[in-house]
Amino acid sequence: MILDVIVEDKLKRLPEHKKRISEEEMTRLAIESQRVSHSFYDALAKDGLSIISEFKKASPSHGNMNNKITLEKRIKQYGESADAISCLTEEDHFKGSTEYLKQIRQMTDLPIIRKDFIIDPYQVYEAKVIGADAVLLIAAILDDSRFKELYDLAYSLGLDVLCEVHNEEEMQRMLNLDVKIIGINNRNLKTFEVDLDTTKKLADMVTPEMRKAGKLLVSESGVADTDDIKVLAKSGADALLIGTVLMEAPKPEELISEFKEVYNAERK
């Protein structure tokens, strides 16, 4: 399964990172950091639909992005209408880099989430140091004990956590852990097939009381056009994380505005 391969490759990559900057040094840099995070949670909690625009060079399901626009221009475009930015830092399958996130941090005050396959505390400390405001934790690759360890560490460093699920079992685990932000991935990371109904099916497990208490839902993956937006509008998600269609759009800022308009109209 592709997910297993990605995690195996990540395990091989980690020693390279730790060789460049030791675990002790990375921990010290993160703890001593004076950087105040931009609230990822607040960006998603505001009225109306929030959109997390993703920067990535490639993906296993799509291949290389059809995009010759520079990083600087793309982030400037995102900044006109997006609410947060997701940056892929996974090297082998998404052609990401921590350097991209560092550069994006210098270009925008929007909250940035480090999107990677995080399995080690080092990666959380590293996220803080390179300028991230939040990290992605994927339920499918972490048991509850490890998940809670990384989750608590992130919040202790002032980082928000997007907790990703794909099925009922993973959703129930996150509800049991009482996490703040749940990301429902419409793409099965084991087969890479997409089903937009996944968001509504899993969102129905979150009670109105939980929503009133502040639990946020993000729908991830699979958006290609306004028809998809209309489907997801029925799910009740607070935010959408959108990657490929925005990366390949010549004017993503206009597409983001259109998506928000359609979504909010459907919700009325």
Curated annotation (Swiss-Prot):
- What is a single Pfam family found in this protein's UniProt entry? IGPS
What PANTHER family does the database record attribute to this sequence?
INDOLE-3-GLYCEROL-PHOSPHATE SYNTHASE (PTHR22854:SF2), TRYPTOPHAN BIOSYNTHESIS PROTEIN (PTHR22854)
Q: Which organism is it from?
A: Lachnospira eligens (strain ATCC 27750 / DSM 3376 / VPI C15-48 / C15-B4) (Eubacterium eligens)
Q: What is this protein called?
A: Indole-3-glycerol phosphate synthase
Stored InterPro entries: Aldolase_TIM (IPR013785), Indole-3-glycerol_P_synth (IPR045186), Indole-3-glycerol_P_synth_dom (IPR013798), Indole-3-GlycerolPSynthase_CS (IPR001468), RibuloseP-bd_barrel (IPR011060)
Named from the GO MF annotations, one term is: phosphoribosylanthranilate isomerase activity
Name the HAMAP family on file: IGPS_B (MF_00134_B)
Q: Show the Gene3D superfamilies listed in the entry.
A: Aldolase class I
According to its UniProt entry, one GO biological process term is: L-tryptophan biosynthetic process
As its record notes, the protein acts as a catalyst of:
1-(2-carboxyphenylamino)-1-deoxy-D-ribulose 5-phosphate + H(+) = (1S,2R)-1-C-(indol-3-yl)glycerol 3-phosphate + CO2 + H2O
Task: Name its pathway.
Answer: Amino-acid biosynthesis; L-tryptophan biosynthesis; L-tryptophan from chorismate: step 4/5
What EC designation does it have? 4.1.1.48
> Belongs to which family?
Belongs to the TrpC family.
Q: Which UniProt keywords apply?
A: Amino-acid biosynthesis, Aromatic amino acid biosynthesis, Decarboxylase, Lyase, Tryptophan biosynthesis
